[in-house]
């Protein structure tokens, strides 16, 4: 088994960063080996987007995914950037491939799913969470995940795990869900092949996304604002 550990990174918060984070990761890998736990750990960060990120990115001590050109980014849910495609473009110009984390969680994207289409055409990779896919975040979010998958707008499924109890991994259930609902080929691409491309720092070959007939799930506004 292989895991890319992606602890949060915010330039203004006191998370573990840089070499200090790398030392913790190396110690964790050592403990796994000493306890005969056959899991390979790779280091990355989930970078919290701030509006000066592009300007300061060369000064920040975050980790791309396994030292690749792929950079995992999440966005503020209540202050979602209006110019997301421009952000993707600017990151590409700086040599990164942005992986947009858990896009199914953003109300703005539910209101206008074609944002995802435009971002993919600009060069972004799209990730959703396993828990969302199998309905643990509600049927409407699950439905939206399926809409994206059916339109070739998802490239990765990840855990968003924060522990063994809170936000625990649900990858096996999610893989089986995709295999049964769609196909083994699609499941392998979303869970294995595309992730391996990131580990190997290779290009992810994506299917052409469908722009038309994207449904808007306005019901989510009521869910998130309760």
List the predicted regions and their residue ranges.
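Active-site environment of divalent metal-dependent phosphoester hydrolases
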Residues: 10-13, 48-50, 105-109, 133-136, ...
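Short acidic/histidine-rich active-site segments
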Residues: 6-8, 153-169
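Extended substrate/RNA-proximal surfaces in nucleic-acid metabolism proteins
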Residues: 14-127, 205-226
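Mid-to-C-terminal alpha-helical segments outside catalytic/metal-binding sites
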Residues: 176-226
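Short beta-strand segments at enzyme active-site cores
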Residues: 1-8, 41-44
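Histidine/acidic-residue-rich catalytic or RNA/ligand-binding cores of hydrolases
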Residues: 110-117, 137-146, 150-151, 164-176, ...
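Short acidic, glycine/proline-enriched helix-loop-strand junctions
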Residues: 15-19, 36-40, 166-193
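Conserved short secondary-structure transition element at the edge of the structured enzyme core
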Residues: 128, 145-159
């Amino acid at each position: 088994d292989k895991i890319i550990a992606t602890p949060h990174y915010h330039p203004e918060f006191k998370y573990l960063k840089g070499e200090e984070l790398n030392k913790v990761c190396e110690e964790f890998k050592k403990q796994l080996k000493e306890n005969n736990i056959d899991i390979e750990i790779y280091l990355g960060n989930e970078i919290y987007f701030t509006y000066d990120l592009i300007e300061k990115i060369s000064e920040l001590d975050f980790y791309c995914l396994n030292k690749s050109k792929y950079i995992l980014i999440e966005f503020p849910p209540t202050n979602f950037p209006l110019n997301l495609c421009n952000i993707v473009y600017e990151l590409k110009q700086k040599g990164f491939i942005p992986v947009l984390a858990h896009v199914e969680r953003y109300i703005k994207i539910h209101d206008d799913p074609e944002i995802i289409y435009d971002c993919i055409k600009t060069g972004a990779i799209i990730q959703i969470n396993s828990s969302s896919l199998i309905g643990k975040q509600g049927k409407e979010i699950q439905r939206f995940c399926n809409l994206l998958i059916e339109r070739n707008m998802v490239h990765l499924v990840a855990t968003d795990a924060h522990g063994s109890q809170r936000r625990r991994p649900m990858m096996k259930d999610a893989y089986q869900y995709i295999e049964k609902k769609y196909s083994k080929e699609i499941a392998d691409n979303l869970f294995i092949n595309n992730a391996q491309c990131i580990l190997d720092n290779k290009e992810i070959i994506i299917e052409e996304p469908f722009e038309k007939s994207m449904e808007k799930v306005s019901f989510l506004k009521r869910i998130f604002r309760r």
